[in-house]
Amino acid sequence: MSVSVLIVDDSAVVREVLSQMLSSAPDIEVLGAAPDPIFAMTRMKQRWPDVIVLDIEMPRMDGLTFLRKIMDERPTPVIICSSLTEKGARITLDALAAGAVAIITKPALNQRAFLLEAAKELVQEVRDAARAKMGVVKRISQGAAEHAPPAPKLTADVVLEAPSGLEKYRTTEKIIAIGTSTGGTQALEYLLPKLPATCPGVAVVQHMPEKFTASFAERLNRLCRVEVKEAQTGDRLISGVALIAPGGKHLLVKRNGAQYVADVKDGPLVSRHRPSVDVLFRSVAVCAGGNAIGVIMTGMGDDGARGMREMHDAGARTVAQDEESCVVFGMPAEAINHGGVDEVMSLERIAHMLAGIRG
């Protein structure tokens, strides 16, 4: 069964390229391309789409206002098509908090070439969005070429060696590692504000484009009792601090004596992502072993499944979010299937469990 899509963007170039690109996928039907939300609402009265690709800054009605109307009337998976600017990042994060499920970034210049180059990724974003459970999104917010073999999926081996079993854990200080993707921004905005300032240091990988993670960390910092910031190499992971992996970079945790410190580095995509949950989890397995708590939450794909198994084998406590509270039960399901999960919990229970751990 095909996925029906409505494109809403005031750029004629973006509308044209997205329409051509998505129409070329045999399982996607483009219902139309509207220059603003007013035209879009007229089209949606005729037939409601399965997925909406939505620009933010448009005439007559901005995308954020339109998104909120959609979520009030009939919650629908929305992919935000946002510019790579600081202002665009802030507004896009507001859109994710309001219920959007994913972000597509577009440059200010050469948009046609950029979108054509990213065709496979964008088509897959639409397919993934169609699987999102919008009832869960709303609840959390309120409290051929496309079928060609995928690009080689690298493992965390390309960034750091697997745990040897010979590591020395020279401290009893605890650390929390969290990995998430689709639906994760809403889940993190629910979970992290529940943590007290006395909780262990937290390292987070949220699949998100570069230039967005700094704004996301700032947003979380305003909501939380713990200090939240985008990770930089050398940052200490201490009690009451949460570090967010920068978009486009891998986040590792290493030891500096008895302390945990962040190591932010370039590298190839791992499990098709950068930052990769597998990389973070492996690094925590190596440096913290049984002193770590690993949490894998809502998201598409299998990033983190192998790393969580490595954390489990190193003695860490490992937790997966349950299907009912996930927007997409992909990453947690894969982690469970890999045998690396000790406990399966709702998002609410995960927050309660982590809030009870002291650094």
UniProtKB/Swiss-Prot annotation:
Residues 4-121 form the Response regulatory domain. Phosphorylated by CheA. Phosphorylation of the N-terminal regulatory domain activates the methylesterase activity. Keywords: Chemotaxis, Cytoplasm, Hydrolase, Phosphoprotein. One of its GO terms (cellular component) is cytoplasm. The active site is at S181, H207, D303. Its main location: cytoplasm. One of its GO terms (biological process) is chemotaxis. One of its GO terms (molecular function) is protein-glutamate methylesterase activity. Its EC number is 3.1.1.61, 3.5.1.44. It catalyses: [protein]-L-glutamate 5-O-methyl ester + H2O = L-glutamyl-[protein] + methanol + H(+); L-glutaminyl-[protein] + H2O = L-glutamyl-[protein] + NH4(+). The modification 4-aspartylphosphate is found at D55. PROSITE patterns: CHEB, RESPONSE_REGULATORY. It is found in: Cytoplasm. Residues 169-354 form the CheB-type methylesterase domain. Involved in chemotaxis. Part of a chemotaxis signal transduction system that modulates chemotaxis in response to various stimuli. Catalyzes the demethylation of specific methylglutamate residues introduced into the chemoreceptors (methyl-accepting chemotaxis proteins or MCP) by CheR. Also mediates the irreversible deamidation of specific glutamine residues to glutamic acid. Belongs to the CheB family. Contains a C-terminal catalytic domain, and an N-terminal region which modulates catalytic activity. This is Protein-glutamate methylesterase/protein-glutamine glutaminase 1.
